[in-house]
């Protein structure tokens, strides 16, 4: 098992239980946790970007993203679903990319491959199957489409953050997680996935 895979798994093992702990600790603690994460992510974005319009756009988006993060995770099952799909997409993409390699997906993020993209979809759909079994719910076409959409958005989020890191000529967005980089490095897909799912929820197309 490579160091990078261990890094991704350990990040998930730490971040998901930590998030769930603050959810169950009560609304005050969860709000506090959300604000701290927002401030850390905003600081990393500020350090990474140079142009004022990028900074303002990023701050505005992060504010909306963490609002949807909080709103989604007040519903335990919704929060778990989005987190699960993002983690599965990240790990599936890494595993398939390393095993099957193949053509690069984009020059912006040279480690991304088409095989990795397929792997992200594959593991996210496997995760959907287990999730729906857990909540005793059949997989509908809407849930299938939502999973594919979230996986796609998560991968796009990864590429977008990689683009700005490339512009700034940095490898990681920060050093807050020892050996793992910054918070944005770990949640790059999630900050795009949560707003997406929030909009899907507002549309009322997913039955539970």
Please state what every model-predicted region is.
Residues 35-43:
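Central hydrophobic cores of alpha-helical transmembrane segments in multi-pass inner-membrane proteins
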Residues 6-7, 29-31, 36:
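Start-of-domain marker
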Residues 199-208:
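Juxtamembrane boundary at the C-terminal end of a transmembrane helix
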Residues 20, 102, 170, 197-200:
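Hydrophobic alpha-helical membrane context
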Residues 1-13, 43-61, 65-128, 133-193:
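Interhelical loop and helix-boundary elements at the membrane-water interface
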Residues 18-30, 44-49:
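Short, hydrophobic transmembrane alpha-helix segments
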